[in-house]
């Protein structure tokens, strides 16, 4: 049961990365690709979670979501919502971890997408502008096709990054409550170093490696065909 929950959770993290973080990061990359006042501050703000230690981030969010006096709890109390324990509730703990992970990871993907956008020659956009191409058509027929390799890299990073998740979960919930936020690496750690079930821990590690290799192979195959 714990193993199934751990892999379900890690696929939830990967799904959050693919379907939420990547679109948000791509949008932010298009924003920072424009010239406007405060651009450096904007870049610093969104890239900051990437360079901060994730244990420190987990401690920060543990305080923010603290059920007795955390800022979120105090705010909800003002609206008459009491008894909220986001990280201590089986139903809300994993979605909260996913959102925090998304905030941690979006900055790195934003920078990768920004590099991909900067590599597209301005002359192509200028020619499209002369031909009366709309912004959506530029995005669909110029930007996305020319960033195929960038999207491939980001997809692999997002998926394998979810399977590397350990420190954030350990700092926020230690896999609780009741195993609700267990992921393969926390399950591996507990079995290897707490329960001395080294064979079981090794099997989890092998499955994780095989899944990541299989996903990377499929992504490379799909993008090669396109």
Predicted regions and their residues:
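A structural signal for multi-pass alpha-helical bundles of membrane permease subunits
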Residues: 1-226
């Amino acid at each position: 049961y714990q193993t199934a929950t751990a892999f379900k959770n890690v696929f939830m993290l990967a799904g959050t990365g693919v379907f939420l973080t990547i679109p948000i990061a791509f949008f932010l990359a298009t924003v920072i690709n424009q010239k406007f006042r405060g651009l450096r501050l904007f870049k610093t703000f969104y890239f900051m979670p990437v360079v901060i230690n994730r244990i420190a981030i987990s401690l920060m969010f543990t305080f923010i979501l603290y059920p007795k006096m955390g800022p979120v709890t105090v705010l909800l109390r003002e609206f008459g919502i009491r008894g909220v324990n986001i990280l201590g509730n089986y139903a809300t703990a994993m979605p909260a971890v996913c959102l925090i992970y998304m905030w941690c990871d979006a900055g790195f993907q934003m920078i990768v997408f920004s590099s991909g956008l900067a590599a597209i020659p301005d002359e192509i956009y200028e020619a499209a502008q002369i031909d009366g191409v709309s912004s959506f058509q530029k995005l669909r027929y110029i930007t996305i096709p020319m960033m195929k390799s960038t999207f491939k890299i980001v997809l692999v990073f997002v998926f394998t990054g979810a399977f590397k998740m350990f420190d954030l979960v350990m700092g926020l919930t230690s896999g609780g409550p009741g195993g609700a936020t267990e992921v393969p690496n926390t399950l591996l750690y507990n079995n290897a170093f707490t329960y001395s079930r080294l064979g079981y821990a090794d099997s989890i590690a092998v499955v994780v490696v095989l899944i990541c290799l299989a996903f990377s192979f499929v992504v490379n195959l799909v993008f090669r065909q396109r």
